[in-house]
Design a protein with these regions (language model features):
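Nucleotide-activated donor-binding/catalytic signature segment of Leloir-type glycosyltransferases, i.e.
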Residues: 253-271
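Short hydrophobic beta-strand element within catalytic cores of glycosyltransferases
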Residues: 308-311
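Donor nucleotide-sugar binding/catalytic pocket of nucleotide-sugar-dependent glycosyltransferases
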Residues: 44, 113, 144-200, 207
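Short alpha-helical donor nucleotide-sugar binding micro-motif in glycosyltransferases
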Residues: 270, 278-283
Length: 390
C-alpha cells in the first residue's frame, strides 16, 4: 500500500519519504539502484524501530507502543527536514489503521491523513464462523474498536488538526463524521495500474459446473466456511477452486470432506503467479467471504479478469462492488448469509446473460480504481492546501 502511494505521488511531486529502517531499507535501496528513474523524485529517510517479538506474541497490541515510539523519532526527523525543505504538504499514508496517527500534524503544515482503515467491526453473527481463538479475538476487538473510535484521544486530536482525511470504507466516512465531527473523502487503499490488461471471463454453459474462485490467506477472518456450507445447498453443479494456504487450511479441508465436497472443491495451495492467474481467468465468478477487511487487492484482480464478485455487504466491499459488477449479501444472520451465497450462485449458473453483463461491468467498473484516478483526487487535495499553513 505505502509504496504504491509514494511512487504514484512522486510522479507529480517531490517526495521525502520517512520509512522504517529495518524492514524496508534493503528492499528500497536495491530497487532504487535497479530502477533509478522510478525514484528520481523520492528521497528516502530511514528511521529504526525497536521490536519486541516475544511481548507482541503475548500481547499483540504492544505493537502500538513501539510504533508510537517510532513515530516520535519520525517527527523529530521531520522537524529538522522541514527547516531545510519547508514542506508544502505532510501526508501520513501508513499504517492504514486509525489508532496511531503519529505526530506529523504538529509540524504546522497542511496534514493529509489516510487512507484510514480499521473502522470495520466483525459482525457478531459471524463470530461463529471462526475458531474459538478467532471468535474471542475479534469479539474483544469489536469492543475495543467501539471505544477507540469514540474516545481515542490520539486519533481525535489528529483528525481535528487534519486538513483532509481519506478513508477506505463508506462506514468509516460515516463514523468519522459521527465521532470526530469531520468530513472524509472515500478512497480505498489498493488499486490497479492504469494500463492493466483486460481479460474476459469464459462463457458458461448451463448444466455444466459453474467455476468459482476463492483466494486469500487461510486465516479465521477470511471465513471460507461460509462458502463451503453454501455449496451443498446449491441446486446447480458447482466447482470451487481455493487458492493460497494458511493456518486454517487443514480445518477447511476437513470441513469440505465432511460436507461431501471432495469432488467439488479443489485446494490448490500456493501456486506460481501464472498458474493462479490461469485459474482465475478460467473461472466464472469470484467469491469473497471475509468477515473483516478494508479492501482486498484480490477484488481488483477479479475485476481485471471480468469476474463478477459475490461478497458480504460490509468492509471495503460495500463501496467497491455495485450492481453493475457483482452481488452484495446483506448481513442479518449466519444461516441467511449461507443461503444467499447458494441462491446467488444458482442464479448465475442459470442466467448466463446476466453473468456476462456483470462480467463486462466488472471490467468497466475497475477503471474508477486505478492509481491515476486516485492521483487526480490527491492532486486536487494538495493543490487546495499547498502553502496554506494550519
Amino acid at each position: 500500500m505505502g509504496w504504491n502511494f509514494v511512487s504514484n505521488i512522486a510522479k507529480h511531486h517531490d517526495v521525502h519519504a520517512i520509512v522504517e529502517k529495518g524492514e524496508f531499507e534493503e528492499t528500497l535501496t536495491r530497487y532504487a539502484a535497479e530502477h533509478p528513474e522510478a525514484v528520481q523524485n523520492i528521497t528516502f529517510h530511514f528511521v529504526p524501530r525497536t521490536h519486541h517479538d516475544t511481548l507482541r506474541k503475548i500481547w499483540p497490541p504492544s505493537y502500538y507502543w513501539f510504533y508510537r515510539a517510532w513515530h516520535r523519532k519520525a517527527y523529530q526527523l521531520a522537524v529538522e527536514l522541514d527547516k531545510k525543505e519547508n514542506f508544502d504538504i505532510v501526508h501520513q499514508v501508513t499504517i492504514s489503521g486509525f489508532r496511531e496517527p503519529g505526530f506529523l500534524w504538529q509540524l504546522g503544515k497542511p496534514f493529509i491523513w489516510g487512507p484510514l482503515g480499521g473502522f470495520t467491526d466483525t459482525p457478531w453473527c459471524l463470530l461463529r464462523c471462526l475458531d474459538l481463538g478467532g471468535a474471542i479475538h475479534f469479539g474483544i476487538r469489536n469492543v475495543l474498536n467501539s471505544i477507540q473510535k469514540r474516545w481515542g484521544r490520539s486519533a481525535r486530536t489528529a483528525a481535528k488538526h487534519s486538513a483532509s482525511i481519506l478513508t477506505s470504507t463508506t462506514k468509516a466516512v460515516e463514523e468519522i463524521r459521527r465521532f470526530w465531527g469531520r468530513e472524509a473523502i472515500l478512497m480505498n487503499e489498493v488499486g490497479l495500474e492504469t494500463n492493466h490488461q483486460k481479460l474476459c471471463s469464459p462463457p458458461h454453459k448451463e448444466g455444466t459446473p459453474l467455476r468459482i474462485c476463492w483466494a486469500g490467506e487461510h486465516i479465521p477472518r477470511k471465513a471460507l466456511d461460509l462458502l463451503l456450507h453454501a455449496l451443498p445447498l446449491c441446486k446447480e453443479k458447482m466447482e470451487l477452486h481455493v487458492l493460497s494456504k494458511g493456518p486454517r487450511m487443514e480445518a477447511w479441508k476437513k470441513l469440505s470432506h465432511k460436507l461431501g465436497l471432495d469432488n467439488v472443491v479443489t485446494f490448490h495451495g500456493f501456486v506460481p503467479r501464472e498458474e493462479a492467474f490461469h485459474i482465475m481467468s478460467s473461472s466464472h465468478v469470484f467469491c469473497i467471504t471475509s468477515v473483516r477487511e478494508d479492501t482486498s487487492t484480490v477484488v481488483f484482480e477479479a475485476f481485471r479478469y471480468g469476474l463478477p464478485i459475490i461478497a458480504l455487504d460490509h468492509c471495503g466491499f460495500s463501496s467497491v462492488i455495485n450492481e453493475t459488477c457483482g452481488i452484495k449479501i446483506p448481513i442479518n444472520a449466519h444461516a441467511q448469509i449461507i443461503a444467499d451465497y447458494a441462491r446467488h450462485l444458482d442464479y448465475l449458473a442459470t442466467h448466463e446473460k446476466e453473468r456476462q453483463k456483470l462480467s463486462a461491468g466488472a471490467q468497466e467498473h475497475c477503471q474508477h480504481f486505478t492509481w491515476d484516478a486516485k492521483m487526480e483526487v490527491i492532486n486536487r487535495i494538495y493543490a487546495d492546501y499547498a502553502r496554506h499553513e494550519v
